[in-house]
C-alpha cells in the first residue's frame, strides 16, 4: 500500500512539475463597463509573466491606467486581490475577472498579493523638483494651460490627483459654444456674434457674471476652437451644431463621438509629443508662497509620501468644481441634499478651492450649484443619448403632458421636472429627430445599458410607448398630435420652443426616463480677465492663475450648456501663456 502511494505521489509530483515545466498562455474573459474584456495571460511555474489585452470596448482614457498600471501591478503581485483604479471600477473588475478566468484555465491558483514585489514596482519620483510652471488638474483647462506654457518655452509639469486624466472634461458631451464658427454658415446662421454670445451668457447667469471675463471668453472662443481643430487635431461634426438652452443662436460645435474622449485623447497625444510630464495619483495639498507673497510652488502627496513642486513662474489651478462632494454641495446650497446624485467625475471634490482660499484667494458665488435636467435615475450620470432634445425631442410628465420648453435653461428645466409627479420626466423622440441628432448611433453603450436597466426602450408606435411608460395612451397620443400640428419654428403656442417643434406623427419612437442631477458648480476662485486669482479686495495674487470650473465669476447663477468647454479652452490657454511669461 505504501509502495503504491509512493508511486502515486511521485507520479503526481512529476505531473505537477510537467504542468509548470514550460510557460503556458491561456485566454480569459471578464465583463467591463462597456462589454467583454479579453486577455491572454502567460504563466510560468504558476506565476504571471505577462498579460496581453486582446479585446475591449472601454473608454480609452478612463481605461488607460487599468490596462497599463493595474495590469503591471497584477503581474508584479501575482494576484488580482488588489485595489482597482478609482474612476474605472467596472473596467478594473473586468480585468481582474479576465485574468482569474485565464488562471483557472491554466490550472493556476492566484493567491494574496505579493506586497514587496508590488512596492518595488512603484516608480520613484524625486521628492523635490523645480519647474517654470506647475499646472494642477489634468482636464481640458489643465491640458490647455500646460500645452500653451510648454509652447511658450516653459518647463512645465501637470499634476492630477486621480489615477486617470480627463475629469469632467472627459465624460461630458464636450460641445463648445463658438459664435461665428465655420459650421454656422452651412446652416444659414449669419447673424451670430461674440457680443450676442456674451449677452446670452450674462443674462443666462441672471446678470451675476463678470462681464469683462465673459467678453474675453466669447471673443476668444473662435481662436480657441480653431486651435483645437488645427493644432490639436480635434475633429468636429462638419454640418451640425447643438442649440443649448438659454442661447439665442445655434452655436455649439460638436466633437466626433459626442463626448470629451475626442478632446482628451488629443490632449494626451500632444502632451506626450511635447514631452510634458503628466503625474497622476498626485494630490495637491498646499500652495507655497515666498516672503513677498508670490505663489512659487505646491506641496503634494502620493500614497502618503510628500512631494514639493517648485514653480518659477507660478501655479495654474485647473481642478474643476465640487459637484461630486455631497457635503460641500449641501454646505453651500442646503436645498441640494443627499437625494441628488451627480453627473460629475469622482475627483470633482473641491479641496483645491480651500487650498486657494488659504493662499488668499476669494471664493465667490459658491451657493450657485446647477443640476442637469436629463440624467439616469439610478446612477445620476448624464443621459447623452437624450441629447436628441436639442433637435426636437419632447419632455413629458407621467400624465403624458409637456410642461416646459425643452430648450429652456437647465435650472428652469430641473425645477420643472421636480414639480412633476414622481420628480421625473420622459424624453420622447422619433426617427425623424434621430436622423439629425444621431444620439442612438453615437452612444450605443448607453443604449444597451439604459435598455437593460429598464428606463429606455424603442417602439414602433405610441401604444408600445404608452405600455412601457404607463402613460395613458389617449393623453400621450393627444400630446404628440398637438406637437405635430405645431411643427416648425414659431408655431409652439404652448411653450414657444425656440428652435421649432418637429413632426412626430411617425415612428419608430425612443423614450427614456430622466431626473435632475448635480452637474456644475458656478462658484470658485475669483479671477480677472487675465485668469489671475484675486483676493477679496481685488488684488492680484502673484504667481497664481485659475481656469475652468475652479473659478467663480464667469457663469453667474447658472452656466449655459456648451459654455464649459469654451471657458476651459480660452482661460486655460490664457493662464498657461501668462505663467510661462512670468518665468522668463
Where do the protein language model's features map onto the residues?
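Beta1/beta-strand and adjacent pyrophosphate-binding region of the FAD-binding site
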Residues: 122-141, 157
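Active-site- and interface-proximal helix/loop "cap" or "latch" segments in soluble metabolic
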Residues: 22-117
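Helical element adjacent to the flavin cofactor pocket in flavoenzyme catalytic cores
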Residues: 255-313, 353, 357-359
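An anion/pyrophosphate-binding glycine-rich loop and adjacent beta-alpha core
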Residues: 349, 353-471
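Glycine-rich FAD pyrophosphate-binding loop
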Residues: 151-171
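Glycine-rich loop(s) and the adjacent beta-strand/alpha-helix scaffold that form part
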Residues: 303-305, 310-376, 382, 571-574
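Conserved N-terminal/central alpha/beta ligand/cofactor-binding core
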Residues: 164-277, 281-286, 395-403, 407-408, ...
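A glycine-rich dinucleotide-binding beta-alpha-beta segment and adjacent secondary-structure elements
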Residues: 286, 475-558
